[in-house]
Amino acid sequence: MKFLLIHQQASNNAQSPVRVVEQATGRGVGWINRYLDREYVRRVANTSLRTYAHNLLHFIRWWESVHPAGDIREGDLTESTLLDYVKFQSSQQPRPSPSTINDRVAVAERAIRDEFPNAPCQIARGFHQAFLWRRPMGLGRPRAGMSRLRVKVPKRNIVPLSVEEVARFWSSFRSSRDLAIVGVMLLEGLRSAEVLALNRDDALLSEAQLRVPGKGKKFRLLPLAPETVQLLGHYLRLERPNPCSAALFVSLKGHARGTRMTAAGLRSLFRYHRQTTSIKLANPHRFRHTFASDMIRAGVSLPALMQLMGHTNIQTTLLYVLVTPQDVYLEYARAVAQHIRPLPKASS
C-alpha cells in the first residue's frame, strides 16, 4: 500500500486543503486527515500545515512497512512505537538531522494522542528529561513532569557571511528586482517566506517603512534603511511590470510575468548566484543571521532586535547572535575606555 499527499480546494472552513490518501484508491487516511483538519481550524499557517502533512506521510509509510495492514488500531500501539520510529530514521541513509527526527516524532505523537487518547504512553529511557512544572502565578507545589521523546540536537553555530563574501555575492546581481530582494534580506532581516509574501502596498517608501507579514499571520512594521528605499524605488520604477499582481516581487519573464515570485524561483535565483560566486553558504537564512550579527555589533539591544526579526521569544533571537572573541575584546575595550575609573596614584 502506498500513500501520497494531495492539495485540493477546501470545500469548507473546517477541512484542510492538504490531505494524505492511499495512492491506489484515493481513500483518505482518516486519523491523519482529522488531525490536519483540527490544525486547519486552529488557523495554523499553510506552510506549517504542509509540514505536518509531510511528517505524517513519512510516519504512515514507515508504519505500513512494519504493519502490512496499514490502518493504525489502538491495540497495535505500544510504549515503544515512537522509539521504533526513531530507530528506523536513525538507520536511514542519508540520516535525517536530529531536528527533523524530533519534528516528525512530535507531530506523530500529537496526532496519535488526539486519535487514540487511551493509547500507551510513549516511554523510552534516556530520551526524556525530567522537569518541575509550576502552575500560573506560582501557586501550589511544583509537580514533576517528563519531556516528550526526542533525540539530542547538537548545538549549531551558524557563522554569518563576511563583509568580503557579502560584497562578492552582491556584485553578481544585475537585476533591480534581485538587488532589492537581497537588500531587504540583508538590511531588514526578512525571512524568505516574508519576502515572497510582501505586497506592493506593504512598501511605504514615502514613510521609509515596510509592513511585513510574519509567522502566525501577524504583521510588524519595520523602518527602512535609506539604501533599501533606494533599491525598492529603482525596482518599482524600472522593472516591475505594469499591470501585474498585488505582489511586490513578481516574475519578470515568460508566461508567469507579473505574477508573484515563487519559493522555487527564489531558490533557483540563489542557487545560480552561489555557483557563480562560489560562495556555498550564501542562502536567504544565512543573510538573516548576517543581519542579526551586524545589528548586535552596531549596538542594537536584544529586545529591539527581537522586534526587528519578528520573534516572540528572546531565546530564539539569541540563537542568531554569534559573538566572536574579537567582538568580546572590542566590547571590553570600549567599556574600559568609557566606564572604568582610573587607578588612584600610589602615595610616595
Q: Where would I find each of the regions flagged by the language model?
A:
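C-terminal secondary-structure termini that scaffold catalytic or DNA-interacting sites
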Residues: 3, 336-348
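N-terminal core-binding DNA-recognition domain of tyrosine recombinases/integrases
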Residues: 32-48, 56-141
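Flexible interdomain linker/hinge and immediately adjacent N-terminus
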Residues: 120-168, 213, 252-257
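Basic, Lys/Arg- and aromatic-enriched nucleic-acid-binding interface segment
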Residues: 159-192, 218, 243
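C-terminal catalytic core of tyrosine-transesterase DNA break-rejoin enzymes
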Residues: 183, 288-312, 319
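Catalytic-site neighborhood detector that most strongly recognizes the C-terminal catalytic loop/helix
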Residues: 309, 314-334
